[in-house]
Amino acid sequence: MVTHLEVCIDNIESLHYAIAGGATRIELCSSLALGGLTPSYGFMQQAAKQSSVPVYAMIRPRQGDFFYNEEELDMMRWDIEAAHQSGLDGVVLGVLTQEGDIHIPFATALCEFAQALGLGITFHRAFDQCRNAEQALEDIIHLGCERILTSGLAPSAPAGESVLKSLVEQAQGRIAIMAGAGVNADNARDLVKNTNVQEVHLSGKTTRPSQMTFIAGQSKMGASDVDDFAIPITSTQAIANVAAALK
């Protein structure tokens, strides 16, 4: 039985759409196109004010790998503090060594700091870049995290079903395994049935056109292939379809 349908969002508009679709928890990010980075303090504050379901903030200071230095560790501490001050329910984090193991000193520092503030912890898909998933699972359990977000080390959760099933069996209820990456209404039911995961994670993304009446075509705000006047948002229907498939 699925206990949580988590939706990742990167704007406040999507918060309302995700909850309307049946999200039971929100992962709050910026820049989902980069895999999700730390949201702003203002976004955390507004989400805490508006949400009727638990909200966990992504704690990821930059794009790229999950091997961080001391300065970045300090930044993550400040961001965890911001999540607490905003009234959020938890944080989502992950730190690795250069060799692809859980960075025990850094992970311990971050987890103990978050736990002392009363925040729940999800270990994110840095797990999927570990060299030894079985050992990483035990390390994360020892850290006291509530769950691991993982695709089963594969490009998508459906492709990682066999590993997801093994992780659930190894965990034996000591930690939740949350399947994420490529989850949709067409595969969610079979994914849960085949792996016994109790939590699933998705973005349910679509886009809407800009509401501006003047469209400037002479400049770009970022990459040339990104349409500045197409706003990525969560599709309420996409989330509702997954929720229905899981009933």
From Swiss-Prot:
<dbReference type="GO" id="GO:0005507">
    <property type="term" value="F:copper ion binding"/>
</dbReference>
<dbReference type="InterPro" id="IPR036822">
    <property type="entry name" value="CutC-like_dom_sf"/>
</dbReference>
<comment type="similarity">
    <text>Belongs to the CutC family.</text>
</comment>
<protein>
    <recommendedName>
        <fullName>PF03932 family protein CutC</fullName>
    </recommendedName>
</protein>
<keyword id="KW-0963">Cytoplasm</keyword>
<dbReference type="GO" id="GO:0005737">
    <property type="term" value="C:cytoplasm"/>
</dbReference>
<dbReference type="InterPro" id="IPR005627">
    <property type="entry name" value="CutC-like"/>
</dbReference>
<dbReference type="Pfam" id="PF03932">
    <property type="entry name" value="CutC"/>
</dbReference>
